[in-house]
Amino acid sequence: MVDKKLYHLVNREDQSEYRGNSRTKVIQVSGVEIGGTRSVVIAGPCAVESREQTLEIARAVKQAGADMLRGGAYKPRTSPYEFQGLREKGLEILAEAKEKTGLPIVTEVMDPRLVGLVGQYADLLQIGSRNMQNFPLLVEVGRYNKPILLKRGLCATLEEWLCSAEYIAKEGNTEIILCERGVRTATSGEYDRYTLDLNVIRPTKVSTFLPIIVDPSHSTGTAAMVPDASRAAISCGAQGLLIEVIGEHTDRKTIKCDETQGIRPSILKKIITSVRV
């Protein structure tokens, strides 16, 4: 059972506006409404690997109908020898992509000391699953005047997830979007990367008024599974999707980060069409 005494700022029953109804807080991100009646799609590369790659994908996801552009400039990798991102140069590339496409930017911040820098470029600051309980980081973004995308930790309970949101809200920032991205289970790695926990969507919406979206890319780890996972997530009540995209003709072997899960822009367009029917 979720102990709602551990969080009250993001608890539905503690806020008179949302008590006793199923309304969701609508969060504005540079003109994009998240939490409304329209399914929001955030799409882009796992990592900003080059200017050419990022601009190509940005134009493609814009044409496919995406609302926002995702892309990692700072990458939390399991091994210190893996590609760590282009860092500030990556942020500059994202800024150029925004200028050329008009798409607001979503990118991850990993360090409390970098919140100000990343916030200069990003319209929506992402807290990744590995940092869901990085409490100094949660406090810092809570003090920053930008909406926050809070991913669920790899093994986090709903209570732990909402307590992390409470850390942010306690500092004054209640512009928080929750993102389910798959959890580690006994079968993780056997036929998928993680397990997409669609069961968490309804109890999350009962417990809090914060909008919830789903990442079908990291949760499945396989491009072929992303379309069905996307449609299932929306059917279960998710209010948006966070999807990784690669170039239409890009060789997966050349991709530096999560090469198996990115979908092609042509597939993205089909997903967007299907979830907005």
Q: Positions of the model-derived regions?
A:
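Catalytic alpha/beta core domains of metabolic enzymes, predominantly
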Residues: 29, 34, 144-247
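Alpha-helix-loop-beta-strand connector modules within alpha/beta enzyme cores
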Residues: 83-107, 141-147, 198-212, 236, ...
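Non-catalytic terminal accessory/regulatory regions of metabolic enzymes
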Residues: 1-41
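Active-site mouth loops of central-metabolism enzymes
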Residues: 39-56, 80-84, 104-108, 128-129, ...
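Catalytic beta/alpha-barrel core
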Residues: 86, 102-111, 123-136, 147-158, ...
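N-terminal small/glycine-rich loop or linker at the start of catalytic domains
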Residues: 24-46, 77-80, 205-214
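Glycine-rich, proline-tolerant flexible connector loops at the mouths of alpha/beta enzymes
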Residues: 70-88, 247-257
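Hydrophobic faces of well-ordered beta-strands that scaffold small-molecule active sites
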Residues: 40-45, 67-71, 105-107, 125-127, ...
